[in-house]
Swiss-Prot record:
GO molecular function: amino acid binding; aspartate carbamoyltransferase activity
Gene name, Swiss-Prot/TrEMBL: pyrB
Binding site for L-aspartate: 86, 169, 223
InterPro entries: Asp/Orn_carbamoyltranf_P-bd (IPR006132), Asp/Orn_carbamoylTrfase (IPR006130), Asp/Orn_carbamoylTrfase_sf (IPR036901), Asp_carbamoyltransf (IPR002082), Asp_carbamoyltransf_Asp/Orn-bd (IPR006131)
Species, as recorded: Anaeromyxobacter dehalogenans (strain 2CP-1 / ATCC BAA-258)
GO biological process: 'de novo' pyrimidine nucleobase biosynthetic process; 'de novo' UMP biosynthetic process; amino acid metabolic process
Name of the featured protein: Aspartate carbamoyltransferase catalytic subunit
Keywords, ordered alphabetically: Pyrimidine biosynthesis, Transferase
Domain of life assignment: Bacteria
PROSITE patterns, alphabetized: CARBAMOYLTRANSFERASE
Gene3D superfamilies in the record: Aspartate/ornithine carbamoyltransferase
C-alpha cells in the first residue's frame, strides 16, 4: 500500500504525505543503484507484469529494471504479440494475466482511464505507466524526487512547465504533485496547447516563454504530442521552436544561474530543446532516468508487499 492506496493510478488521488512516502523510500532505493552488485531480495517470489499497449523505451525498461533489482520476476507483455490483435478486450486480457497470479500489473494505454478500469476488475495492485493524456504518476513522482534532490526542497520553489501541456500526461501528474509539496507552477505554451481550468490547481498560464521562466528554479520542457493531435495546432515545428523552444542563448539570457532543466523524454532535439541545452550543465535529464528506477523500485516495493517488512536495501 502507498498510504491508503492499493494502486498507483493518479497523483490527483495522492496526498502530500503519500507522495513523500514514495520519494523518501526512493532515496534509500537509489543507494542500491550505486552498489557494485545491484540486487536486493526485498521482492523475491513476487511477480510484476508490464502490460504495454503503447511504445515505450524508458518507462518499460525502468519498471523491468526496478523489479529485477528487487528480485521480483518481471514479465513483459506487448499488444502486438498478443490476442488483442485477435479482438480480445482490455479487461479480458487483464483478467487472463491476473489468473497467472501477478502481484502488480503495470499498464500503459492510449485511452485515459484504462488503468482504473483494469483496477476495478482485478485483485492485484495496478500501476499506471501512462494512460492517454490523463496522467503518468511514476513520472510525476520521479520529477518530484529529482527536483527535491537538486533544489533541496520544493517548498517555495517555482517550476515552469513549457510546451504541449494539453496533451501531456506528465504535465498533469506534475501539476497535481508539485503544489502539494509547496511549489508554484507556471504553464507556458501555445494557447491551442493549454488545457482549460488549470488555474483552479494553482497554476498560472503564460504564452511568453521569457516571462514564464523568469526567476524559475526549474524548467520542464515537453515535446509536441503529435500522436495525440488530430488537426495541426501550430503553424509548424520551426515556428514553434522560435517562440517556445529553449536554446543556449535563451537559457543564458533568461534563466537564473541555478535553474535546472528537465524533460520526460523522448526529446525532439532542435524543437523544444537545442542539443547544447539538453546536454549542458543545467540539464538533469539523465538524473531523471536514474531516479526513475529508484522511484519505481519504491512503488513496487510498497505495492507488492514490502511495506511493513524490514527494507533490505
Amino acid at each position: 500500500m502507498i498510504g491508503r492506496h492499493k494502486h498507483c493510478i493518479a497523483l490527483e488521488d495522492f496526498s502530500r504525505e503519500e507522495i513523500l512516502e514514495v520519494i523518501d523510500l526512493a532515496a534509500s532505493m537509489k543507494e542500491v543503484l550505486q552498489r557494485p552488485i545491484k540486487k536486493v531480495p526485498s521482492l523475491r517470489g513476487k511477480m510484476v507484469v508490464n502490460l504495454f499497449f503503447e511504445a515505450s523505451t524508458r518507462t518499460r525498461s525502468s519498471f523491468e529494471t526496478a523489479a529485477k533489482i528487487l528480485s521480483a520476476d518481471a514479465l513483459n507483455w506487448t499488444s502486438s504479440s498478443s490476442s488483442v490483435t485477435k479482438g480480445e478486450t482490455l479487461v479480458d486480457t487483464a483478467k487472463n494475466l491476473e489468473a497467472m497470479r501477478p502481484d502488480v500489473l503495470v499498464i500503459r494505454h492510449s485511452a485515459g482511464g484504462a488503468p482504473r478500469l483494469v483496477a476495478e476488475h482485478v485483485g492485484c495492485s495496478v500501476v499506471s505507466a501512462g494512460d492517454g493524456a490523463h496522467e503518468h504518476p511514476s513520472q510525476g513522482l520521479l520529477d518530484c524526487f529529482t527536483l527535491r534532490e537538486k533544489l533541496g526542497t520544493l517548498e517555495g520553489k517555482t517550476v515552469a512547465i513549457v510546451g504541449d501541456v494539453s496533451h501531456s500526461r506528465v504535465a498533469r501528474s506534475d501539476l497535481h504533485a508539485f503544489p502539494k509539496l509547496g511549489a508554484k507552477v507556471r504553464l507556458c505554451g501555445p494557447p491551442t496547447m493549454m488545457p482549460a481550468g488549470v488555474e483552479r490547481l494553482g497554476a498560472t498560464v503564460h504564452t511568453d516563454l521569457r516571462e514564464a521562466v523568469d526567476g524559475a528554479d526549474a524548467v520542464i520542457m515537453l515535446r509536441i504530442q503529435h500522436e495525440r493531435i488530430g488537426d495541426p495546432l501550430i503553424p509548424g515545428t520551426r515556428e514553434y521552436s522560435k517562440v517556445w523552444g529553449l536554446n543556449a542563448k535563451k537559457a543564458a539570457d533568461w534563466l537564473k544561474p541555478s535553474c535546472v532543466i528537465l524533460h520526460p523524454g523522448p526529446i525532439n532535439r532542435g524543437v523544444e530543446l537545442s542539443p547544447e541545452v539538453a546536454d549542458g550543465p543545467r540539464s538533469v535529464i539523465l538524473d531523471q532516468v536514474q531516479n526513475g528506477v529508484a522511484v519505481r523500485m519504491a512503488i513496487l516495493y510498497l505495492l507488492a508487499g514490502g511495506a511493513g517488512e524490514e527494507a533490505r536495501a
